[in-house]
Every structure is written in structure tokens, then in C-alpha cells.
Design a protein with these regions (language model features):
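Short, low-complexity, charge-dense intrinsically disordered segments
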Residues: 11-14
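Sec/Tat signal peptide C-region and signal peptidase I cleavage site
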Residues: 48-52
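C-terminal His-loop and adjacent cap/lid subdomain of alpha/beta-hydrolase
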Residues: 53-735
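Bacterial N-terminal signal peptides
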Residues: 37-45
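Bacterial N-terminal signal peptides that target proteins for export
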Residues: 25-37
Length: 735
């Protein structure tokens, strides 16, 4: 039996390598052959247990979803809430890369155990399934896929996480089965967030593992006490904190280490140390291993940085193995070890797509790069991947990892999130001298998924996304692998704000209103295209992205942004938004000899990291006369605009000296009339100049919508909706 398994593997791998460079359809067919052969061969050796697997699926409850609402031909849905219990062989080749897995406690079989929440939305009638399993990687414990693809999603985070809101039911009308799983070990409970139980690393002599932790602390209102994990992106939702080894912050440890607390006004400002006697570990009443007290008060708009010795790190890298093993279980396994049947449609004809937004998109890229899209049986786990607004990497596989951290120009600026390699294909980094690509490991064993990389303009402005499109110095466009498509959504921000926008200043923490240009319509079209590629072997549209070659991706000092004055259009007072040509600079960061930047893995000992001399070449979108991005997917809102939409905004001056306003774009409306814009000194044509009649506006919307449908970047049903809105409402009064 084993010989037959090996023969199948060798034959298929040899054949696949011979034709892998051929056209998309040949490559996709061979990948399918390899996947089917691996699946079949894995069934031949069921007597040999996998070295990493889900051993028990504990079903907590199964019930009708969405109040019994029916969705087109699919009918009704059910929601299933469960816990998956898994185990890992720390000595297996696919698990050895996990940081500290050798220090994790083991069960009687020598395995490392974990338990993860699982949530499923499935057609009540399995025959109505579209044979697509969509795996949702939660963002800081919260489900995101429904919010990405279903329109009209209104409700609370708790309701979204409990699968109570379906919006317009887009995914359900398709017959898609949705599976979400927890992976992040430091998310605090609440709002029905998904939780995971991961082991704590322990030294072989039973003593606690310790190490240095750097925690950037911020607050939106004055306070005297914070949790040690209270960063910009780790306070809401809350994250647990690594414990300090000592609550007396004035005590010098045996090796000479003493914790420090500093403050600065912006990321590149000098750190000013706060005297050790002016702060303490605790809530200002009681000493605590997980809190900090500053009697003088933590202030908004400042970056506080605590560097302390922590203990008991969670083995966070197991999160990648969870993604691998949960995906493999639901696609290929008939039942768990206790006889509980697989609750979703599965088998060789069923295809899987993994998607995640922002933090979760970086998780997907890192999971693939570290080799976790290969199951223990040797086959590809996820057939397709759709990382959304996640251009960097996820520093999860690190001792004392802080996966809730991000990569802002001001906030979380120098946490590990952007280590070379940046591109899916191989590039050579002239700064580090390494040659590498994110798909190296999966290319070696033919387990790469078909990838739709989705990003916004903000990812280019603040998220360093251009490094995924060019060589490391930004001098030329990088070749794109055949299994990858990239779609940059022009003039969009990281995630659209809730509407209506604030009518009067202050506009949140930003200088002007945020950018409401939605992702939904482009994301829906992309999803259908990816499903067609994965399931039906339909060649997808070519990538749509700005480029160096055509002049739509340029250095920031070459952007021709218009001079837009302060205005009072519609009775809303808006200041002039000054274009500064700023970018979110990036140098090689040295976190110490225990950190492996090629894998974004290891142990951080240099905190803060030492910054290298050479800088990577960051590029941004060129714009038209209205300040709207020229390259990328220009949706209906940009083809028939009512204002300028950008991928950047600025903080109010009292926050971080006016640097990039975290993950926010800008909306600057046009004047209603020619007279109004001339009085304001606005160079952009007014609404009446662009659309002298309602019919002219409807015609403009229809023309853009038709071109997007032809390009397969807008679904026909969404074209009808957008044109109907234009016909009913005329020129949009707001974003």
C-alpha cells in the first residue's frame, strides 16, 4: 500500500514539474491531478495516522440560521458551532518550523494539543451546495467574510460573529459553505469572538520561559493605568498581556536588565525615558503582572513604549498549523476519531478557498510562505486564497508574538510585519543579499493555491504594498507568477467608514472626512472569478494594478496631486488637505540573532530593533486632475465621481504631529456649482459641470458600470443595483 502511495506521488510530481510553466489551464489541470492523486493516495494509508490532525470535532449546537430566511435557489441555511481538538507531532517535518513547539507540553502519545472554536454556515439542503468551502480567517477573533462579500450588513460585532446578519445574502445565494476557525492565542473573550486554546512554552527543567517584550502603548483618552497590551490595534478588541517576571519595576534583574518606559510624539521622534520611580506595574492601587500605572497620566496622541522581561509565552505559531489541519479535516475526512461525522460537503470535487482581511490577509500570506498549505499527507490544503488588504506578513511564529500589532506610519511602525520577501515570485534583495519569494516552499512541492491578492490604495500609501508589485528598490515591475492575480482597488482606504460621514469637524482623529468608497462590488466580482478559476478552470481576468512601466506607480514626490482649498460645500467646513509626499518608510530592522527574517520567525532580542541604513523603494499611485488614482480597478464611484477619493489622510495636529491618520483615506467633495468652486478657488470641475442633468449622471454611471461588467470586475446584478440607485436618486448628494 505504501509503495502504491509513493508511486502515485512520484509520477504526478514528475509530470507536474514538466508542464508547470505552460499556460494557466494546463497548470491548473495538473494541479488538480496532483491534488486528486494526493487525496486518493492519502486514502490508501488511512491505517497510518497523520502527524498533525483534528482528532475530535465537538459539536456544540446546530440550528436554523437567519430566522429561517430562504436565499434564492439555495434555500435556507444552518449554523453549526463547534470546537475542534487537534494534536501535532513536534518532530514532524511540517511542524518543526513552529517556534517553541519543542517546549510545549505533550500528551501521553507525545503530541502537542490545541482546541479551537469553529463556526459553520451551510445550506440546509446539502445538494444545493456550490461545492465551495470558504474558510474565513477571523481578524482579532471576529469573522469577516460575510462583511466582505454581502452588502447591506448592519448590526453589532456580536451579531456578526453569531451569524445573525445575512445582509443581501450574496454568499448564501451562491450556495457557499462558510467555515471560520480561531487561530490567535491572545484575543480576549467578548462579542462572540472566536477563541483558541494554545499551549504555553516551558523550559525542559520546568522553569518558565522568559524574554524581552516591547509593548507600544496608546490611549484615546487620558488615563493613569493601562493593560500591558494596550496598543492602538490591541485595545479594541482587547488582547491579553504577557506577564512581567517582576512587579517591582525598580528592581534590577540578575543579568542587569531593568524595564524602561519611554514617550515620544511620533514614530521617528527621539524616545524620552520616564524615570523609573514615576511609574509602576499595577493598576495604581494593586501591583499587577499585566498592568502599568503612570500617576501623571497617559495622554492621547503620544507613543509610550514599555520594554520589560516577560514570562510564559504562548506557542502562537500553532495558529498556522490549525489553518492547515482544520482545512484538511473538513475537505477530506469522513469523521473524527470518535465517529462524529464531517458536517460539511466534502470530497475530491469540493474546492476550498481561504480568505482573510487585513491582519488575516497577512496570516494567509505567511501561512503559505511557511509551507502550511501542504497537509501531512502531502497534498494541497486550500485550492484558492484571497488575502484582502494584507500586503505584509504575520509575525505569529515568534516567541512572545504580538499578532494584533500592525504597521502604521506612526503607530506600530517598527514591529515585524514587512520582512523580505515581499513578492509571491522570487526577487533578489540588494540590501540583505537574499533571493526569495513567498511561494518558494509551495512551489517546491506543488501545493500553491490559486491566489487573488486584493488591496486598496491605502495599502500603497501606508501599507508599503508597492513592494509586492516591484523589485525591492522600486525600479521595475516584478514578474507575477501564473497562479497569482493582483487587483488594487483604486482610491480606496483600508476599510470604508460607517455612513453617514461626520457632518462637522472634528472628523474623528483625521483632518478631513474619511474615504467611503466601498470594496463590496469589486470583492464580489473577484470572488466569482476566483471560484470559476478554482472550481471550473475558467481563466480569470488579468491583474489590474498600477505599474512602473506605464507611469501609474511612482515615487511620492512625482504625484501630481491638485491644490484643493479649504471649502464649505454643503455647509460642511473642511480644511485644505496639504499633500506632503510622505510615505511609510521601511528599512531592514535587526531584531537580534535569534530572529529569522526570511521566515518572520524566531526570538526578538533587540528591542527596539536596530534600523539599517538602506531604505526600500516605496511607490504610490499617480493621480488624475481630480486627485483620483489612475491605475487599478476604478469602480463606479470613481468613474462617475462626486468628489476626490484618496488612499491617505492626515491626523489632526495634536495626534502624532499630523502624520498619516491610521488606515484612513480622504473624501473631498466637488462644489455643487461652477460659481461655488470659482469662489473657493477649487480647480476641480463642479457637479453641474460634470452632470448638467440627471440623465447625464445616469449615463455616466451606466457607461462605467458596463465597462466594469465587460472587464468582469462588476457583477451584472450589481450593475443593475447601481444604475437603479442613480435613476432613483440622481447625482449622489453624499459619498
Amino acid at each position: 500500500m505504501l509503495e502504491a502511495f509513493l508511486s502515485v506521488q512520484i509520477i504526478v510530481i514528475s509530470a507536474s514539474k514538466a508542464i508547470y510553466k505552460k499556460n494557466d489551464k494546463s497548470r491548473v489541470k495538473m494541479n488538480r491531478l496532483f491534488h486528486a492523486a494526493a487525496f486518493a493516495s492519502s486514502m490508501m494509508i488511512v491505517a497510518a495516522p497523520a502527524q498533525a490532525r483534528i482528532t475530535q470535532l465537538e459539536i456544540l449546537r446546530t440550528e436554523p440560521a437567519f430566522g429561517g430566511e430562504s436565499f434564492g435557489n439555495t434555500g435556507t441555511y444552518e449554523r453549526v458551532f463547534a470546537r475542534a481538538h487537534g494534536e501535532l507531532d513536534p518532530g514532524a517535518s511540517g511542524n518543526k518550523i513552529i517556534q517553541d513547539i519543542e517546549l510545549a507540553p505533550r500528551n501521553g502519545r507525545g503530541m502537542v494539543e490545541y482546541t479551537t472554536d469553529v463556526a459553520i454556515l451551510r445550506p440546509a439542503d446539502v445538494a444545493k451546495s456550490n461545492d465551495i468551502l470558504l474558510f474565513d480567517v477571523p481578524n482579532r477573533g471576529s469573522k469577516r467574510a460575510m462583511l466582505l462579500f454581502n452588502a447591506d450588513m448592519r448590526g453589532s460585532p456580536a451579531a456578526f460573529n453569531n451569524f445573525e446578519v445575512a445582509g443581501d445574502g450574496f454568499l448564501q445565494r451562491q450556495g457557499t459553505t462558510l467555515i471560520a476557525f480561531a487561530w490567535q492565542g491572545d484575543v480576549a473573550p467578548g462579542d462572540n469572538r472566536m477563541m483558541v486554546q494554545l499551549p504555553t512554552a516551558i523550559n525542559t527543567d520546568g522553569s518558565p520561559v522568559t524574554g524581552v517584550v516591547r509593548s507600544e502603548l496608546t490611549t484615546l483618552s487620558p488615563t493613569v493605568s493601562l493593560n500591558l497590551s494596550a496598543g492602538w490595534f490591541t485595545s479594541t478588541p482587547p488582547h491579553t498581556s504577557y506577564k512581567s517576571v517582576e512587579t517591582n519595576n525598580t528592581k534590577v534583574l540578575a543579568d542587569g536588565f531593568r524595564p524602561t518606559l519611554t514617550v515620544r510624539s511620533r514614530a521617528n521622534a527621539p524616545r524620552q525615558e520616564i524615570p523609573v520611580n514615576d511609574w509602576s506595574f499595577g493598576d495604581c492601587n494593586t501591583p499587577s503582572e499585566t498592568q502599568i500605572c503612570l500617576p501623571a497620566g497617559f495622554q492621547p496622541g503620544k507613543l509610550y513604549e514599555l520594554i520589560y522581561r516577560a514570562k510564559e509565552p504562548t506557542v502562537m505559531g500553532i495558529g498556522f498549523a490549525i489553518a492547515r489541519d482544520v482545512g484538511a479535516f473538513f475537505q477530506q475526512t469522513e469523521h473524527d476519531d470518535t465517529g462524529v461525522p464531517n458536517p460539511v460537503v466534502h470530497g475530491p470535487k469540493v474546492k476550498s478557498i481561504i480568505t482573510g482581511s487585513s491582519q488575516s490577509g497577512r496570516f494567509i500570506r505567511s501561512m503559505i510562505a511557511l509551507g502550511f498549505n501542504r497537509s501531512e499527507e502531502g497534498h494541497r490544503v486550500y485550492d484558492g486564497a484571497m488575502p484582502h488588504i494584507g500586503g505584509g506578513l504575520m509575525p505569529l511564529n515568534i516567541r512572545f508574538a504580538q499578532p494584533g500589532r500592525a504597521w502604521g506610519q506612526q503607530v506600530d511602525h517598527d514591529y515585524p510585519a514587512y520582512d523580505f520577501p515581499f513578492t509571491y515570485g522570487r526577487e533578489t534583495d540588494p540590501i540583505t543579499g537574499r533571493s526569495q519569494g513567498l511561494l518558494d516552499r509551495c512551489n517546491d512541492n506543488n501545493t500553491c493555491p490559486l491566489i487573488f491578492h486584493m488591496a486598496t490604495a491605502l495599502e500603497l500609501w501606508e501599507g508599503r504594498q508597492s513592494l509586492g508589485l516591484t523589485d525591492p528598490l522600486g525600479l521595475r515591475d516584478a514578474p507575477e507568477p501564473e497562479n497569482v492575480r493582483t487587483f488594487i482597488m483604486a482610491s480606496t482606504q483600508h476599510a470604508p467608514p460607517s455612513l453617514p460621514l461626520p457632518a462637522n469637524p472634528p472628523f474623528g482623529l483625521c483632518q478631513v472626512q474619511s474615504n467611503p468608497n466601498p470594496h463590496t462590488w469589486t470583492m464580489r466580482a473577484a470572488f466569482i472569478n476566483l471560484v470559476g478559476w478554482v472550481r471550473d478552470e475558467t481563466t480569470p481576468p488579468a491583474s489590474i494594478k498600477p505599474s512602473v512601466a506605464d507611469g501609474t506607480l511612482v515615487p511620492a514626490d512625482r504625484v501630481s496631486f491638485p491644490l484643493i482649498p479649504a471649502t464649505n460645500y454643503g455647509g460642511v467646513t473642511r480644511p485644505a488637505l496639504r499633500y506632503t509626499g510622505a510615505v511609510n518608510s521601511l528599512q531592514v530592522l535587526d531584531f537580534g540573532p535569534g530572529f529569522r527574517p526570511e521566515d518572520s520567525s524566531g526570538i526578538l532580542t533587540n528591542e527596539p530593533p536596530k534600523s539599517g541604513v538602506g531604505s526600500y523603494g516605496l511607490l504610490v499611485p499617480q493621480v488624475d486632475a481630480d486627485g483620483i488614482d489612475v491605475g487599478g480597478v476604478r469602480d463606479v464611484y470613481l468613474g462617475a465621481p462626486i468628489g476626490t477619493y484618496t488612499g491617505w489622510n492626515a491626523f489632526r495636529p495634536e495626534f502624532f504631529d499630523g502624520g498619516f491618520c491610521n488606515f484612513q483615506g480622504s473624501f473631498l467633495p466637488f462644489a455643487a456649482t461652477k460659481k461655488e468652486r470659482i469662489v473657493a478657488g477649487d480647480p476641480r470641475p463642479s457637479l453641474e459641470e460634470r452632470y448638467p442633468t440627471k440623465e447625464a449622471y445616469v449615463s455616466a454611471v451606466s457607461k462605467v458600470a458596463d465597462s466594469l461588467v465587460e472587464a468582469r470586475m462588476l457583477l451584472p446584478e450589481d450593475r443593475e443595483r447601481l444604475i437603479k440607485e442613480a435613476q432613483e436618486k440622481g447625482v449622489r448628494a453624499g459619498p
